[in-house]
Swiss-Prot record:
Chain intervals for the UniProt region annotation (Helix alpha1): 44-55
Organism: Rattus norvegicus (Rat)
Family: Belongs to the ninjurin family.
Annotated site, Cleavage, chain positions: 56-57
Low complexity bias (residue ranges): 16-27
Name of this protein: Ninjurin-1
Biased composition annotated in UniProt, kind: Acidic residues: 1-10
PANTHER family: NINJURIN-1, NINJURIN-RELATED
Region (Disordered) location: 1-30
Length: 152
């Protein structure tokens, strides 16, 4: 018995064209049936997260500008400046963390524990950023509406 026959016997009938073989079904979405490149997937995911982080960073910078323009007379000036500053610092930290996550090779089993820790850390920091931004939204950054009509 040759090794090729044993493989077919152990795994079922996987000869090209047989039912259930990768060659029997047409590829979905025009792609070939091949294993997922984990590094490529992780890099795309990190790039998407980085873009969202940049968008939130820009929004927080705009909010900080609006709060500073309102000045000290705004009721929630200090809490908003502190919360927005915390959010900005955490976002920069997550951005740097994502750069390190993209840098490492996921196929190296020796680095799996470190990558898992960094990924969990990034997820935790993103959760904290979301909570901080919920409070920023609750305090509000909009300018108060001024009465146009004179009071009598």
């Amino acid at each position: 018995m040759d090794p090729g026959t044993e493989e077919y016997e152990l795994n079922g009938d996987l000869r090209p064209g047989s039912p259930g073989s990768p060659d029997a079904s047409p590829p979905r979405w025009g792609l070939r049936n091949r294993p997922i490149n984990v590094n490529h997937y992780a890099n795309k995911k990190s790039a998407a997260e980085s873009m969202l982080d940049i968008a939130l960073l820009m929004a927080n910078a705009s909010q900080l500008k609006a709060v500073v323009e309102q000045g000290n007379e705004f009721a929630f000036f200090v809490p908003l400046v502190v919360l927005i500053s915390i959010s900005l610092v955490l976002q920069i930290g997550v951005g740097v963390l994502l750069i390190f996550l993209v840098k490492y090779d996921l196929n190296n089993p020796a680095k799996h524990a470190k990558l898992d820790f960094l990924n969990n850390l990034a997820t935790g920091l993103v959760f904290i950023i979301v909570v901080v931004n919920i409070f920023i939204t609750a305090f509000g950054v909009q300018k108060p509406v001024m009465d146009v009509a004179p009071r009598q």
